[in-house]
Design a protein with these regions (language model features):
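Extracytoplasmic/lumenal domain signature
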Residues: 1-269
Length: 269
């Protein structure tokens, strides 16, 4: 955190700034991974939530810069957790794991966590096997949750949407798969393989009647419009280069960038 300690003198029309930086650090020996933070931070009140490449998800009080709780997810966490407050006053995180340079296949974990206690509410029981091609593969080949989950609204208010990269399917093919899980139980409602890898965070679009749509990109350069209730792909548009960032939307207008250095404006009709 950075306290700016500003002082404004109205009479002399001057302002002074005396910034004081407070840093939070920690050490761990859970796994032999680099202790980097790939994802972003979620926040609730004074609390900040983030995971690291060693698989430690933690809550830090931003006033005291002290850990409130920390849990070991067993594999790397590379996504920004999604946070939701429910009508009963509960505060929850949705997140998942990713495989580092292990050169192996392993189960990908999709979880709902109590944000105030760190207790695991549920873990998806679907057999989602992530496959890492080799220890020499590029970071883009990481298997697991690289994208932020989408907290459903409208007609999909009971769903949480995960984009899981580099999943090994029953026929041994590899691609990203979008999973819709029941927020209350973690049970799988639908899944949609994408045929290629994807690290793009899905966004939700909602009509006034609550009808829901999902927009996301993939490494093949395809911008995809999906039915949020069923997962069916309704329309696609290929932009020529990989889409790894999250699209931004306003009404029926979407802006998205590609790794080819282009920024596109797309209108939904």
């Amino acid at each position: 955190t950075l306290a700016m300690n500003t002082s404004f003198d109205l009479n002399n029309a001057t302002i002074s700034v005396n910034p004081v930086k407070t840093a939070y650090g920690y050490t761990g020996s859970v796994r032999d991974f680099k202790q980097g933070i790939t994802g972003g931070v979620a926040s609730y009140g004074d609390y900040a939530y983030y995971g690291d490449d060693t698989g430690i998800l933690q809550c830090v009080d931003m006033n005291t810069m002290q850990a409130v709780w920390a849990i070991d997810l067993g594999e790397s966490m590379m996504c920004t957790p999604a946070l939701e407050t429910e009508e009963d006053g509960g505060v929850y995180l949705y997140t998942g794991t990713a495989l580092g340079k292990t050169g192996r296949s392993a189960q990908i974990r999709l979880l709902k966590i109590d944000a105030l206690t760190g207790d695991i509410v549920w873990e998806c029981q679907s057999a989602i096997k992530g496959k890492y091609a080799s220890k020499d593969a590029k970071a883009g080949s990481y298997a697991g949750v690289m994208a932020s989950p989408l907290v459903g609204e409208g007609e999909i208010n009971d769903l949480i949407i995960f984009n899981v990269n580099h999943v090994e399917l029953d026929d041994k093919s590899i691609c990203a798969v979008v999973y819709a899980l029941d927020k209350a139980t973690g049970e799988e409602v639908w899944n949609q393989p994408l045929d290629v890898d994807s690290k793009s965070s899905p966004i939700g679009l909602y009509q006034r009647d609550g009808k829901s749509y999902i927009v996301m990109g993939d490494d093949g350069g395809t911008l995809r419009l999906m039915d949020g209730f069923s997962g069916t792909t309704l329309s696609t548009l290929n932009l020529g280069s990989a889409i790894q960032a999250s699209p931004a939307a306003y009404g029926n207008e979407i802006v998205v960038g590609t790794t080819g250095g282009m920024l596109y404006f797309v209108e939904l009709k």
